[in-house]
């Protein structure tokens, strides 16, 4: 169903062509206890589209896991893969994506020493991502990279994240608004700077007064209900709507996730994105 405002109806949440979803890492503590019950909970929230957290199938066979997804009208549209697997075994990653008929593969982290993310790390990542992305593209699957803030360091006057984006021939990007705001950046300005490069998004808000950094670390308890923190979520979603970002995944890593996600959904439902 495609409408002109955010709605949560019949298990589907859409913002025009953008389909709302959930990043399953949010429920990393719930899944090991009760997979069927957790899927049922997600369904009750009106969520349909999912991005996995690279946690496997929790002891179920692939067929059993897929059956539980189908029973709850859930679909994994994006699968995650560690950097090393993209480098050493991209065929395994692609097979995992095919298990769900997912059209996106996302990598969340580029290995580097401590807080020192360098140009050499960036160049290594470009090689791995472009090689894997070209391989996936032959099967109609898109590789995206999810920055975590450490990419905002500079080399010879250029931000390393700019270097990544400008040389991303066979891969695109997933913006986590928390991890763009945490280093002191404006997510909306980055969306406008690169209007074609961001294909996916994580919607995650940050507690007011939280001090940021550029090392990719934070206290997960600073994750708060969307619209109550220090990030202008409404402006980000409005810009994402203009750009046609396909999936907007709600993510909440805090211990308050079970009541904050429904509150976040209610907030998104309240937005009037047709207002200028």
What do the predicted segments below correspond to?
Residues 1-19:
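Bacterial Sec-dependent N-terminal signal peptides
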Residues 13-104, 172, 273-276:
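N-terminal pre-domain/capping segments
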Residues 16-24, 112, 210-215:
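N-terminal small/glycine-rich loop or linker at the start of catalytic domains
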Residues 22, 42, 50, 69, ...:
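Conserved, mostly hydrophobic/aromatic
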Residues 27-33, 52-62, 81-89, 113-117, ...:
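Acidic-and-aromatic substrate-binding clefts and catalytic sites of carbohydrate-active enzymes
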Residues 138-230:
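Acidic/histidine-rich catalytic cores of soluble enzymes
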Residues 257-276:
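C-terminal helical cap(s) of enzyme catalytic domains, especially alpha/beta-barrels
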């Amino acid at each position: 169903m495609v409408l002109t405002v955010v709605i949560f109806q019949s298990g589907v949440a859409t913002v025009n062509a953008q389909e709302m979803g959930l990043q399953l890492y949010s429920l990393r503590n719930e899944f090991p206890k009760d997979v069927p019950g957790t899927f049922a909970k997600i369904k009750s929230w009106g969520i349909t589209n999912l991005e996995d957290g690279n946690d496997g199938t929790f002891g179920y066979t692939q067929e059993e896991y897929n059956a539980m997804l189908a029973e709850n009208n859930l679909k994994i549209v994006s699968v995650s893969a560690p950097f090393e697997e993209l480098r050493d075994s991209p065929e395994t990653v692609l097979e995992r994506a095919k298990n769900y008929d997912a059209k996106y593969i996302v990598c969340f982290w580029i290995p580097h020493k401590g807080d020192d993310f360098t140009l050499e790390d960036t160049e290594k990542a470009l090689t791995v991502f472009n090689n894997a992305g070209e391989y996936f593209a032959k099967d109609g699957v898109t590789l995206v990279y999810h920055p975590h803030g450490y990419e905002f360091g500079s080399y010879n006057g250029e931000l390393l994240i700019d270097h990544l984006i400008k040389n991303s021939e066979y891969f695109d990007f997933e913006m986590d608004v928390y991890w763009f705001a945490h280093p002191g950046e404006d997510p909306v300005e980055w969306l406008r700077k690169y209007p074609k490069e961001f294909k996916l998004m994580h919607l995650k808000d940050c507690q007011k007064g939280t001090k940021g950094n550029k090392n990719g670390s934070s206290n997960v308890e600073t994750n708060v209900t969307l619209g109550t923190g220090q990030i202008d979520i409404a402006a980000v979603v409005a810009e994402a709507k203009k750009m046609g970002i396909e999936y907007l995944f709600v993510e909440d890593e805090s211990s308050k996730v079970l009541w904050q996600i429904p509150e976040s959904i209610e907030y998104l439902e309240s937005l009037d994105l047709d207002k200028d």
